[in-house]
Amino acid sequence: MTVARWLRLWERGQAMLHVTWGSKVRLWSLVPALLGTPRALSSLENRMGVYRKMWNPKEPCDWAQQYRERFIPFSKEQLLRLLIQEFHSSPAERAALEAFSAHVDFCTLFHYHQLLARLQALYDPINPDRETLDQPSLTDPERLSSEKDVLQALRPLLAQANFSPLSEDALAYALVVHHPQDEVQVTINLDQYIYIQFWALGQRVGQMPHKSSVGSKRGFFRKLPPVERRYFKRVVLAARTKGGHLVLKSFKDTPLEGLEQLLPELKVRTPVLQRALLNLMLVVSGVMIFVNVGMVILSDLKMATSLLLLLFAAFMGVKASKVFGQRRSAQALELAHVLYYRSTSNNSELLSALALRAQEEHIKEALLAHSFLARRPGGSQGKPEETSRWLQSEVESWLLAQSGCDVTFNGPRALAHLQALTPSLGLFPLPELPQLDPMVLGTPEATQAALGSSYPSP
């Protein structure tokens, strides 16, 4: 091969490398434009730096203002029994409320079934668990664009299900602060993530369920008594790693400080105190072995001191590596065991679960609005703003008295749900039923055409 030919091949290789690298740079530069930066990770790192400088923070800054509980802490059946006991004690009133509840069930069924079908159609091209025949693979920009559409369609459904988004400050607190009774701790590399978003409902402060706690029942030398912790009954995660895909997962009974344990890319690490205790135990045992065995070897085998120290250091290094490896394996197994019980649904199944939860919250809001407005002089007559404010105040006070939970009730939305119900029983819901997201549900003309058809086949 001549020098000139070699130079031409080298220049061609440099040009191909430039094109390949340029395409990768252009692809990742599209990520903020396609996803709208759901989580600015650089800003998240800055917030994490603030919490690292704090001494033993107990909760995120201004947590009471950051997180407002909106979940109604009763099932539909429990709420129906409470409303009957409180406001509909006569047989006629009870029958009327039960008929109204069945009417709301019927009116919302088609609405959320259609919403779920549209949402699953959006998610199907990027579903990693698809069991049907393989479809043509998407390019990275197409996949990112599809993920953006799914997340945009998912947010109003989560809002109707009364999930509250966790702020960037709360996530920074969760990534930095570790509870002292969490024996298993993990670490993540933010550079591996494109976006991270959490939603939560059902905040509780108390002892966590046994199978959902990670190492909180034992210390290093003795058992530790259970302590009260801040945790959530349900948590939804949406995360995307570089080179990966959109991860949608739901978990139960998750502590605020344990959110990072739910992320897809993590490494188990040994806490500093446990690492120090293990090192101390290794040093003490090593000194005892050296005193009891090393001196005998020096005197009997006439081995050089430097060689003996070298062999002893190698032996202790192997032993330390084995001890720490076994410790990390045990912690990883315990974390996997706990996540097995915490996990409730993921990916496509999560969409179905969210649609059912949103429908139930929709029904509960309509039942509360119906029962409380029936007690109000004039009912729903008057200005909508005044009516919704009165409804919100009355329902929040009643929920606090019944459950002890400070719940923020969405009065305007509940009033809109009540007013959108069909005027007579036995009919499909009218097109005026509030749409959670026009992009998901389609145009009003398409909805009208669907509603004008006969009963759907079972």
UniProtKB/Swiss-Prot annotation:
PANTHER family: TRANSMEMBRANE PROTEIN 143, TRANSMEMBRANE PROTEIN 143 FAMILY MEMBER. This is Transmembrane protein 143. It comes from Mus musculus (Mouse). Keywords: Membrane, Phosphoprotein, Transmembrane, Transmembrane helix. One of its GO terms (cellular component) is mitochondrion. It is found in: Membrane. The keyword Transmembrane applies. The keyword Phosphoprotein applies.
